[in-house]
């Protein structure tokens, strides 16, 4: 494995650890006491910025040697995810809201995991990302962690106060 890839994966590992700590200590304790729509809203707003993935298509931001198969897949997957996040925000408090959030989060997670799969198969080297290096090393770990929070909210969300009340009644 080339040394630049070691630094790349080490950067990603540190981001996963740091964002995991932030999520566990600051984000989840705040979200878990909110109603489902209120808990999902800030996470969906964050994901509406996934259009940043288009940076891999901008000449001069990335190396001309960046494999096009990887670049187009990652960029368009992110644009679709950003669009679904915005649609989820618009419909969140409607009858279709939760279903659209499920679609968004399934797509968004699959898109990020697909990029992890596509990168080595397309022959991507970390240096080819140029200025977009921060996307997989800083942003993607945050996005994956927040997808985990979204799934947790969708699967089990009940505000902490309601959980405490139900325990007292039992």
Q: Where is each model-derived feature located?
A:
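Hydrophobic transmembrane alpha-helical segments in integral membrane proteins
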Residues: 1-19
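Membrane-interface helix-boundary motifs at transmembrane edges
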Residues: 28-40, 91-99, 159-160
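Membrane-water interface at the C-terminal end of transmembrane alpha helices
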Residues: 20-25, 88-92, 142-161
